[in-house]
Amino acid sequence: MRVNVTLACTECGDRNYITTKNKRNNPERIEMKKYCPRLNKYTLHRETK
């Protein structure tokens, strides 16, 4: 079962990306290095509720 999740920047808190994940294969929160336009650099983005 795939669900939509929102990724938020850990440094500025902006919610920049929406992606999908499979809850059966990845039950924990996902983390990705993505581009943050506010900070103009690549930062760690975490899944938010």
UniProtKB/Swiss-Prot annotation:
Family annotation (PANTHER family): 50S RIBOSOMAL PROTEIN L33, CHLOROPLASTIC, LARGE RIBOSOMAL SUBUNIT PROTEIN BL33C
Protein name from the UniProt record: Large ribosomal subunit protein bL33A
GO cellular component: cytoplasm; ribonucleoprotein complex; ribosome
Any one GO biological process: translation
NCBIfam families: PRK00504.1 (NF001764), PRK00595.1 (NF001860), rpmG_bact (TIGR01023)
Alphabetic keyword roster: Ribonucleoprotein, Ribosomal protein
Family: Belongs to the bacterial ribosomal protein bL33 family.
Cross-referenced InterPro entries: Ribosomal_bL33, Ribosomal_bL33_CS, Ribosomal_bL33_sf, Ribosomal_zn-bd
Pfam families with a match to the protein in the record: Ribosomal_L33 (PF00471)
Entry GO MF terms: structural constituent of ribosome
